[in-house]
């Protein structure tokens, strides 16, 4: 299994003037399938959607605390996490991004490359390679004697493989490798493997339901963390893209939502959140 993931790893909207529905429903002259996913995320996992050349996306992502706390924390309002993300399209198939999350004061840089696109009556899949590096700036040498800068670093690489099955249904697999130089569970390997499974079903012209699930493949037996399961809705109206969702993982960076999901759907320990994008 490790050899498989290593092989995969080394393979090479607030307001805007144009209605995004027109953009995503446009078919190119090369007969590519379009609009497999409306958002840059399925829910937690990256989708195969790309930012177009010379476009800049500003994405605000917000996750409230657990709704299980009830009125004490106003159903999670007092324990919110926010992530700000800037994504730029160098070309239609090359995106770069930089973000900052309040969860562990995490900074992240990422590179997203589209390797191949699904084409009608030809190639059946879109394949995108996503790579990221992050820094956990909340770690403090006063609390962790011997802490070095390298211990704050984490890395992730994913191969995103999607298929637009028909006008309503799109599916995606995301084999993932991620590495943390410092782990919170002693028995946990620094190098970790996961498989993301996700999909989108179009409900109306402007609404869709999205689901994704991450299967951690080498989680330590003593780990208190869970596999992330998320359910959300995408809404497009005018230049706005809203993603509303429930998930058992409050953090939004790859290493963190796959490695540190603390919620439990069976106990109602879940987090409500949203993403909103503006295109420049």
Regions of interest found by a model, annotated:
Residues 4-5, 165, 202, 280:
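Small/flexible residues
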Residues 223-224:
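Intrinsically disordered, low-complexity segments enriched in Gly and acidic/Ser/Thr residues
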Residues 18-146, 153-157, 162-173, 177-181, ...:
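Transmembrane beta-barrel domains of Gram-negative outer membranes and organellar outer membranes
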Residues 168-217:
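A mid-sequence, solvent-exposed acidic-amphipathic segment
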Residues 1-22:
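Bacterial Sec-dependent N-terminal signal peptides
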